[in-house]
């Protein structure tokens, strides 16, 4: 996609949350080739939770992930956060909702919204296909959402 940076199309984005609920972007060194590699150094931050750091990893906006490896320092714990029981915000739209032209996955407006609201977001943005199809709206009606956002 010549109009988007490789970090948006194929990259990942990592954010951490402090004990006050404030989220911060974690800068990384990255390499793009046959394999995309991100290296994060010194991911210790002030004001952490009692149990350590909490991170959110945003996956590529356009390219799929066939394999993902996450390494942690020896002696560290790695646990997944339990899925939220809160009803999600469901977003239906076109390429802009999908994340087109965002510089990084975390900068797609849907992911910014998720961080600002601190609630789950289901992103149903499809490049070239946000056509307000009746059948799709019937499927949307089956989702128990806190709110629907239609961006077409």
Name the predicted role of every residue range:
Residues 48, 55, 59-142:
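Serine-esterase "nucleophile elbow" of acetyl-processing enzymes
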Residues 143-147:
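Short acidic/histidine-rich motifs immediately flanking catalytic phosphotransfer sites
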Residues 149-151:
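Structural motif
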Residues 1-88:
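N-terminal secretory targeting modules
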